[in-house]
Each structure stands twice: as structure tokens, then as C-alpha cells.
Amino acid sequence: MFVSTAFAQTATESQPASTAGEHGAADAVHTETGVAHDAGHGSGVFPPFDSTHYASQVLWLAITFGLFYLFLSRVVLPRIGGVIETRRDRIAQDLEQAARLKQDADNAIAAYEQELAQARSKAASIAEAAREKGKGEADAERASAEAVLESKLKEAEERIAAIKAKAMSDVGNIAEETMATIVEQLLGLTADKASVSEAVKAIRASNA
């Protein structure tokens, strides 16, 4: 088949036009994609630092602090207040009991001193009588008086030691109960009695 010169020239002239049209369409697509791409990026500001979000951020911050304050005032603070009030009552009871035990100890000491004074007076009178009755009888009576004095002294010391031991035992038990109550109220856990006892003993040993 032969192609005429006019047809070949027409085909050659129309080819650049179609090529230019294709390039124009591609550029248009690229331009539209670029616009969409740039629009997708937006302003590029980190949302927490964007001034348009300040109002909502302040609102949520106020709501969060309000809920936190409500939780503290309705749950945490009443529990702590109850524990402190219970501890205050226990301390008052401990002080009253300690005062009573101290009064008992003072009474026991006063009775011991009175008995000691009487025993010394009796020993002095026995010594005076020994000059008349003889040294042998005086020594025997003195030994008897000293034995009685020693027995009464030992009895008084045992009474005082028992009172002090009871006081320390009561204070230790109260401290263990109070610590267990505080742990249960604040942490919601049941404290092991042995662990609480060891902790109280360690504190008392460090303060001794």
C-alpha cells in the first residue's frame, strides 16, 4: 500500500498535538493530586499546641480536676479522717490507761517505801533491844527482819514489773491493731498479724 505525501504530513502534524494533550492531562492530574496532597497535610501544627483546640482542652482539664477533687473529698479524705479520728481516740484511751497504770505503780512504790521505812524502824528497835537481850538474839531477829524485808522488797518489785509489763503489752497490742486498721483503710488489704507485730517490734526497738 502506498501512502500519499499529503496524508503522511497530516499524520506527522497531528502527532505532536496528541502528545501535548496527553502531557496536559498528566499535568492536570499531577496538579490535582498535589493540591489534594497539600490539603491533606493541613496546617502542620501539633494538635495540643493548636489554638483552635484550647477551649476543649481547658474544658476537659476542668472536668478531670473536678472528678479528681470529688474522688478525694468523697472517698480518700473521709477514709483518712476516719483513721485519724480512730487513732486519736485510741491515743486518748492509751493515755488514760497509761495514767492509771502509772498511778498503780506510784501506789505500789509508796506502799513499798512505807513498808521499807517500817522495816528499818523495826530493825533499829531490834538493834536497840539487842544491847539488852544479847547479841545472839539480836542477830537472829535482825536476820529475820532482813528476810522479811527482802521478801517484801521482792514482792514489791514483782508487782511493779508486772504492772509495767502489762502496760507495755497493752500498748503494743493497741499499736498493732491501729497499724492493721490503717493499712486496711488506706490500701484495702488485710494486714498479716505476724508482719504487723514484727513491724511494731522493730519500731519499738529502734526507739528504745
Swiss-Prot record:
Gene behind the chain: atpF
Protein name as annotated: ATP synthase subunit b
HAMAP family per UniProt: ATP_synth_b_bprime
Keyword Transferase: no
Gene Ontology, cellular component aspect: plasma membrane; proton-transporting ATP synthase complex
Main localization (coarse): membrane
Organism this protein belongs to: Brucella melitensis biotype 1 (strain ATCC 23456 / CCUG 17765 / NCTC 10094 / 16M)
Similarity remark: Belongs to the ATPase B chain family.
Lineage of the species this protein comes from: Bacteria, Pseudomonadati, Pseudomonadota, Alphaproteobacteria, Hyphomicrobiales
Cell compartment(s), UniProt: Cell inner membrane
Keyword Transmembrane on entry: yes
Membrane disposition: Single-pass membrane protein
Transmembrane segments: 56-78
Record keywords: ATP synthesis, Cell inner membrane, Cell membrane, CF(0), Hydrogen ion transport, Ion transport, Membrane, Transmembrane, Transmembrane helix, Transport
GO molecular function, one term: proton-transporting ATPase activity, rotational mechanism
Ranges where the record places region Disordered: 1-26
Function according to Swiss-Prot or TrEMBL: F(1)F(0) ATP synthase produces ATP from ADP in the presence of a proton or sodium gradient. F-type ATPases consist of two structural domains, F(1) containing the extramembraneous catalytic core and F(0) containing the membrane proton channel, linked together by a central stalk and a peripheral stalk. During catalysis, ATP synthesis in the catalytic domain of F(1) is coupled via a rotary mechanism of the central stalk subunits to proton translocation.
InterPro entries assigned to the protein according to its UniProt record, in alphabetical order: ATP_synth_b/b'su_bac/chlpt (IPR002146), ATP_synthase_B_chain (IPR050059)
Biased composition (Polar residues): 1-18
Subunit structure: F-type ATPases have 2 components, F(1) - the catalytic core - and F(0) - the membrane proton channel. F(1) has five subunits: alpha(3), beta(3), gamma(1), delta(1), epsilon(1). F(0) has three main subunits: a(1), b(2) and c(10-14). The alpha and beta chains form an alternating ring which encloses part of the gamma chain. F(1) is attached to F(0) by a central stalk formed by the gamma and epsilon chains, while a peripheral stalk is formed by the delta and b chains.
